[in-house]
Amino acid sequence: MYFTEITMKNLFYGLLLTLLFTTTPAAAYNSSDLNQLMSSGSCAYGDLSGADLSSLDLTGANLTGSNLTGARLIKTKLAGAVFDKAVLTKTVLTDAELANTSFKAAQLNYTNFSGSDLKTADFTQANAFRAKFANCDLQFAVFYLTNLQEATLDSSNCLEADLTQANLSYAWLYNTNLHEAVLVYANLFNAKMNNANLSNANLTGATLSQALLQNANLNNAMLDKAVLDQTDFKGASMNFTDFGTAFKTEAIFE
């Protein structure tokens, strides 16, 4: 009898654990907020966390202050949408149409924008720690005072983007086009920028200590007052590069 009771208890707890770990969790979003978005195209300060909004046309949507944590917006049309102060932690926005969008002061930690059109998007003061912008069109985008620490921007087009005072420490910018980009007083400590195009870029006062710029294009770039402690420029093209009063302590040029 005693053995049978123990066996039954073990079976019960085993079944309970199985249910706990295999049952699919319910969607976290608020149904009324989702309905509002679907009917009006906007949902400011709503809870849309975990919602799948992929391939929808949400052009110009107002999503100010909304919670979109873990939501999926793959190939979604969002040109001109407003995400100011919204939370998009671990949100997937790959291959989306996001031109002219606003992400001012938004939380974008671990957000995946890979392959998206983000021309003229505004990320002023957004927090985008470890966000992914690989292969994105970021022409004329604004990243003023944006936290992009450990973010990935490999092979993205950042033509004339404004990254003034942005934190790009430990960021990945392999093969990134930063032609005529503004990186004044940006933090690029230990950034990986091999093969990047920084021609005509303004890096005045930028911190590039321990950054990798091997085989990068720095033709006509401005680096006055930049901090270049142990920066690796091996193989870089530097025709008419203006170092001005840059701090070149132990910089590596060959």
Where do the language-model regions lie?
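Absolute protein N-terminus
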Residues: 8, 28-29
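Sec-dependent signal peptide recognition
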Residues: 9-16
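N-terminal signal peptide c-region/cleavage motif recognized by signal peptidases
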Residues: 23-25
